[in-house]
């Protein structure tokens, strides 16, 4: 009979579970070949009964906060290393570090829209300081100070100077559109926020999710059909600096440069619905929809800034 190698020990992923949530890609690269079977050793190379190999994912605990993006991130890495080891030959000189660089460069193929990488000249992807704007018939253009050309359009809102800053002044009917979809993790999104009137509003919205503020003044993320709330109340009529940091493991909130909370899964229990996975692809399509307040100094980085750097940025100091 013919065999396809889908070895459980090496090739099986189990998203969100304590047993191999993420397949050990480095171990596979360094120790596995298509003729390796964990339970029975190996077979001879070029054995005509061995047809090849597959990787597998058992993703059956969606209620724990697992989204299609979580599965995609894991499966993409599994499939890439399997392809390298199955079809890439046996180049003994290639190191895992070299393979990793090649993977990051190639990663997803053309037309794979789950990936949300934004081309940028530097790690600063987007910078709306609202200093350089131009009014027109179709709204006010806000120019991207990051130099990437991701200019935004303000509809039914104004840009005003207050407290030495230029603010996007929203009255509940206006918004800002960017022409972008989302920024993938790792990322850092930082902005100044002033709530004039509490109410449910979407601060950042798009196909991949939503960062909103509730009538209680608390920020919350919506991803797939999950809603997770940060336990911090944004004060009314007071400016605060908000920083959201997203990685493959966690979504963090900083206020005025100080760490407040991390949304993350802290238990392996499959019935704990209070601590969900919290990977959050940050939406950038529409800003301020339904919000009655002001936003200033919006910056988006395609990396997770360190706590020290976040503190400096919140104080208005230049960061790289």
Regions found by a protein language model. Name each.
Residues 1-126:
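Flexible, acidic glycine-rich loops studded with aromatic residues
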Residues 118-150, 156, 160-320:
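Extracellular glycan-associated modules
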């Amino acid at each position: 009979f013919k065999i396809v190698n889908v070895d459980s020990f090496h090739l099986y992923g189990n998203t969100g579970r304590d047993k191999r949530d993420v397949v050990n890609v480095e171990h596979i690269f360094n120790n596995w070949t298509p003729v390796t079977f964990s339970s029975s050793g190996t077979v001879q190379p070029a054995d005509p009964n061995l047809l090849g190999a597959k990787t597998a994912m058992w993703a059956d605990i969606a209620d724990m906060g697992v989204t299609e993006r979580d599965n995609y991130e894991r499966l993409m890495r599994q499939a890439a290393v399997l392809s390298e080891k199955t079809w890439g030959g046996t180049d003994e000189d290639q190191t895992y570090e070299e393979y990793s660089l090649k993977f990051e460069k190639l990663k997803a193929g053309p037309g794979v829209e789950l990936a949300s990488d934004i081309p940028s000249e530097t790690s600063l992807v987007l910078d709306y300081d609202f200093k350089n704007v131009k009014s027109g018939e179709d709204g006010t253009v806000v120019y991207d100070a990051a130099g990437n050309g991701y200019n935004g359009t303000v509809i039914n809102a104004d840009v005003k100077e207050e407290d030495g800053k230029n603010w996007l002044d929203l009255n509940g009917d206006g918004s800002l559109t960017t022409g972008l979809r989302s920024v993938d993790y790792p990322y850092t999104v930082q902005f100044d926020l002033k709530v004039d009137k509490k109410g449910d509003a979407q601060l950042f919205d798009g196909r991949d999710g939503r960062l909103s503020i509730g009538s209680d003044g608390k920020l919350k993320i919506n991803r797939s059909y999950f809603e997770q709330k940060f336990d911090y109340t944004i004060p009314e009529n007071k400016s605060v600096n908000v920083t959201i940091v997203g990685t493959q493991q966690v979504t963090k909130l900083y206020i005025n440069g100080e760490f407040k909370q991390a949304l993350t899964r802290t238990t392996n229990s499959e019935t704990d619905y209070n601590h969900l996975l919290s990977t959050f692809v940050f939406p950038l399509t529409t800003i301020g929809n339904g919000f009655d307040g002001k936003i200033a100094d919006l910056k988006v980085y395609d990396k997770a800034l360190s706590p020290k750097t976040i503190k400096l940025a919140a104080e208005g100091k230049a960061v790289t």
